[in-house]
UniProtKB/Swiss-Prot annotation:
Species classification: Bacteria, Bacillati, Bacillota, Bacilli, Lactobacillales
Described purpose of this protein according to its UniProt entry: Participates actively in the response to hyperosmotic and heat shock by preventing the aggregation of stress-denatured proteins and by disaggregating proteins, also in an autonomous, DnaK-independent fashion. Unfolded proteins bind initially to DnaJ; upon interaction with the DnaJ-bound protein, DnaK hydrolyzes its bound ATP, resulting in the formation of a stable complex. GrpE releases ADP from DnaK; ATP binding to DnaK triggers the release of the substrate protein, thus completing the reaction cycle.
ZnF CR-type span: 135-217
Signal peptide: none
Every J domain range: 5-69
Record organism: Streptococcus pneumoniae serotype 4 (strain ATCC BAA-334 / TIGR4)
Residue stretches of each CXXCXGXG motif repeat: 148-155, 165-172, 191-198, 205-212
Superkingdom assignment: Bacteria
GO cellular component: cytoplasm
An example Gene Ontology molecular-function term: unfolded protein binding
Protein name: Chaperone protein DnaJ
HAMAP family tied to this protein: DnaJ
Cofactor (UniProt): Zn(2+)
Length: 378
């Protein structure tokens, strides 16, 4: 067996995170579960998935598997340099794990019957620019795995109950003897009859087919606070998918996506607005109405205003998520040069130019400009 077979069984890469491995396991475990999938070979696939997950979900076993393959994960080899000592860095996790291997004690093995929280879900909600500024409330509708309403989550047909597994006697695990360089070692593996649940379902529920879960439509109202931005998340506890073995529901994470505005741009609590002025307004000054998310504001444009000039409108920006402070809005001027002038306008501009000195001081050449001129032959 190569050192990637377990990863291949779960359909993940060798660099997969613990969460990616868990999600892949749950998906495949549900797909090949003997109570659901009656196709030939499904049970063997289920056992292979269980074996792979048992190793890859344990950091110590996974490290040994990555280095030595299945033999290392099963305790056949120690860490680097032989047996790696008894400090937990080698193939065994110290004296406790050694005695656990011999006598089937608790050690570091997890209890397969322990309650486990359900999977978290993610939902993207779209907001207008203004909704993100002022906050809003949205109804989120989605489907999730919930407790089966027919069997109340037991997985058993109504009127029947799961019974204690006769092979593992409710433990969910069985002891398996393995030959190693140190001799015969005992380890615990998931029960191949009840698949770690400790109970057998003789008569599966016809709705959920023994899983205890069913896909259900669900909706919840979420309050979007004022000042949110794209990518920020709102956590709704207990609104994810149903847990396992009586564990709690997972959480729902509502991810915000804010639509772009055709007027404004935003960075945090600061809002930006571009103001176009004609050259007469810029030269003589004017009073103009500036749109803000809080309503129009009068802005006095002084004489001689140039392109790039910025004006600050205090407290006309977005609120802080932390409450209290409200940002500012900055107005940036762009002086627009007129095009398509008629004859009268051209004459007027020429007279205007002749009436005074319109020369603009040329930009002073810098060091690199002189070098460029030299190469250009000037």
């Amino acid at each position: 067996m190569n050192n990637t077979e377990f990863y291949d069984r779960l359909g993940v890469s060798k660099n997969a995170s613990a969460d990616e491995i868990k999600k892949a396991y749950r998906k495949l475990s549900k797909k090949y579960h003997p109570d659901i999938n009656k196709e030939p070979g499904a049970e063997d696939k289920y056992k292979e998935v269980q074996e792979a997950y048992e190793t890859l979900s344990d950091d110590q076993k996974r490290a040994a598997y990555d280095q030595y393959g299945a033999a290392g994960a099963n305790g056949g080899f120690g860490g680097a340099g032989g047996f790696g000592g008894f400090n937990g860095a080698g193939g065994f996790g110290g004296f406790e794990d050694i005695f656990s291997s011999f006598f089937g004690g608790g050690g570091s093995s997890r209890n397969p019957n322990a309650p486990r929280q359900g999977d978290d879900l993610q939902y993207r909600v779209n907001l207008t620019f203004e909704e993100a500024i002022f906050g809003t409330e949205k109804e989120v509708k989605y489907h999730r795995e919930a407790g089966c309403r027919t069997c109340n989550g037991s997985g058993a047909k109504p009127g029947t109950s799961p019974v204690t597994c006769g092979r593992c006697h409710g433990a969910g695990v069985i002891n398996v003897d393995t030959q190693t360089p140190l001799g015969m070692m005992r380890r615990q593996v998931t029960c191949d009859v009840c698949h770690g649940r400790g109970k057998e379902i003789k008569y599966p529920c016809t709705t959920c087919h023994g899983t205890g879960h069913e896909k259900q439509a669900h909706s919840v109202h979420v309050k979007i606070p004022a000042g949110v931005e794209t990518g920020q998340q709102i956590r709704l506890a207990g609104q994810g998918e149903a847990g396992f073995n009586g564990g709690p529901y997972g959480d729902l994470y509502v991810v915000v996506s804010v639509e772009a505005s055709d007027k404004f741009e935003r960075e945090g609590t600061t809002i930006f607005y571009n103001l176009n002025l004609n050259f007469v307004q810029a030269a003589l000054g004017d009073t103009v109405d500036i749109p803000t998310v809080h309503g129009d504001v009068e802005l006095v444009i002084p004489e001689g205003t140039q392109t790039g000039k910025k004006f600050r409108l205090r407290s006309k920006g977005a609120p802080s998520l932390r409450g209290g402070a409200v940002g500012d809005q900055y107005v940036t001027v762009n002086v627009v040069t007129p095009t398509g002038l008629n004859d009268r306008q051209k004459v007027a501009l020429k007279e205007f130019a002749a009436a005074g000195d319109l020369k603009v001081n040329p930009k002073k050449k810098g060091f690199f400009d002189h070098i460029k001129d030299a190469f250009d032959g000037e």
